Regions:
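C-terminal, well-structured catalytic/ligand-binding subdomain of enzymes
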Residues: 1-41, 45-46, 50-82, 105, ...
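Secretory/export targeting leaders with adjacent low-complexity proregions
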Residues: 89-108
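Charged, amphipathic alpha-helical segments
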Residues: 86-95, 197-203
C-alpha cells in the first residue's frame, strides 16, 4: 500500500491530531494541527474517508513573484482534505484556486486508486511529479523543489541522508511505517561525513533528518484497491 511520510519542523512543538466531521457537503477527515491553533484553521498532514491523503514540505526556491500573500499551505490542505477524493481532484482544485494562491511548497498526495505524486506549487504555477514515473518506486522532498531555482533552498544534505536510507530499504523491500518513524525520523547519520552520530554525547544540530525544531513524524498508510 502507498505510504505518505511527513517529518515536520515547526515553531510550535505541540502538535495534535484533530478529527473533522463531514459537514456542509465536506468529507470527513483527520489532520495534524498546531497546538496553538485552537480553531484548527490549518492542517499540516491528514487523510479523509475517501482514502485521499496529503502533506507538505516548505520550499525555498520556488517563489517567483512579488505577492505579499504567503503561508497559506495549512489553509489550503484543510480545504483539500474536505473536498478531494483523488489525486486528479487535487490537480483540478489547484488549477481552480484564485491566484495568487499564497503558497511555496511541495505537496505530497496519495489516493485509494493508486495515485501518488508530488506537486511543487507557488502562487501561480504547479509542477507535477508522479511516483509511477520514478524508477525507484518512491519520491522524496525536503525544503527545495526540483522545478525551482538550482542551488537555492534548503535540505540538500538532509535529502541525501534520506535517499541513502530509502535506497537500501527499497532494495530489501523493507520500507514500513515503523521503519520510517523509528529509523528515518531518528537517524543522525551524516552522508557528507560518512558517520552516524546517534551514540555521540554531543553533536552540532545541523543537516540531520531530525532536529530541535522537529515537532512530529507522521506516516499515513494508503488504501489498497480492494479495501474500503
Amino acid at each position: 500500500r502507498p505510504l505518505l511520510w511527513k517529518h515536520r519542523d515547526a515553531s510550535d512543538l505541540n502538535n495534535r491530531i484533530v478529527h473533522f466531521e463531514a459537514e456542509g457537503g465536506k468529507l470527513e477527515f483527520v489532520g495534524l494541527v498546531n497546538g496553538v491553533d485552537t480553531m484548527a484553521n490549518e492542517v499540516w498532514a491528514g487523510d479523509n474517508t475517501s482514502g485521499f491523503a496529503i502533506m507538505n514540505t516548505a520550499s525555498y526556491n520556488l517563489k517567483n513573484d512579488t505577492s505579499s500573500l504567503s503561508d497559506r499551505e495549512g489553509v489550503v490542505m484543510k480545504q483539500v482534505l474536505g473536498e478531494c477524493r483523488t489525486v486528479e481532484d487535487f490537480a483540478r482544485l489547484l488549477d481552480s484556486l484564485p491566484r495568487p494562491i499564497g503558497v511555496e511548497a511541495n505537496f505530497g498526495v496519495v489516493d485509494a486508486l493508486g495515485g501518488a505524486a508530488y506537486f511543487e506549487v507557488n502562487s501561480y504555477e504547479v509542477f507535477r511529479y508522479d511516483v509511477k514515473d520514478s524508477p525507484d518506486g518512491y519520491l522524496l522532498r525536503t525544503n527545495y523543489s526540483v522545478s525551482g531555482r538550482p542551488n537555492e533552498g534548503y535540505g540538500y544534505i538532509r535529502y541525501d541522508n534520506a535517499a541513502r536510507l530509502f535506497s537500501r530499504a527499497a532494495s530489501e523491500r523493507s520500507i514500513t511505517p515503523e521503519w520510517i518513524t523509528g529509523v528515518c525520523s531518528r537517524s543522525f547519520y551524516h552522508i557528507l561525513l560518512g558517520r552516524d552520530f546517534t551514540t555521540d554525547a554531543w553533536v552540532v544540530d545541523q543537516d540531520f533528518i531530525p532536529r530541535r525544531s522537529t515537532s512530529a513524524s507522521v506516516v499515513i498508510e494508503g488504501v489498497k484497491p480492494e479495501e474500503s
